[in-house]
Amino acid sequence: LERKESSEVVHIMQLGDSHTGGDYFTQAYREQMQKRFGNAGIGWLSPGYIKNQRSAQVLMRMNGNWKTRVSRNNPENFPLGGFANQPEPGASIEIVPKQPLFGLQRVTIWTRRNHDDASGGWKLSFPDGEVRDLLAPLTSNWQSSYVMGSAIDLNSFTLRAENNPPELGAIIIDTLAPGVTVDSLGIV
């Protein structure tokens, strides 16, 4: 990567407590690693606003009703990070990167069905009015679904829950280019 001869993406994940979850120390490390090896994107984000978790790279605005689950309270079926958010129909998260994105991007969400009825999916809306569907999960295991878009489209977007929404476990934004992502997971 350092010689710019590789097409690989390296994902680095820093695990820690709420200080890590605040993304202060990790952001300085991320900047150095991406400057040296290339920027492969924002990487892993918590499933919306979670107490003691923050991203130095994006602003998140949540609308509607959400119920947050934390693994320390009941450690059953959690994604990496130990948090999950259950939206009511129509609830949404607006995600605005703090720095402009460039190139082709992939937005991935981790979701799971947490009831017997078939889950609805998610809609990803862009400022120009374009809406893309993300696949609904088929089981109660965590599953990923993604869409691709140009950075121009992804400099602001809204993730909206449909009818009978699945639980949200993570949002991941990757630049489809060689380099490094550095994720901070404050597991409390």
PLM segments and residue spans:
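A short acidic-Thr-Gly-centered motif at the start of a beta-strand
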Residues: 1-8
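Loop/turn elements at helix/coil->beta-strand transitions in domains of secreted/extracellular proteins
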Residues: 8-11, 178-180
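Short hydrophobic beta-strand that contains or immediately precedes a catalytic carboxylate
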Residues: 12-16, 184
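Conserved SGNH/GDSL esterase-like catalytic core that processes O-acyl groups on lipids
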Residues: 21-126, 130-188
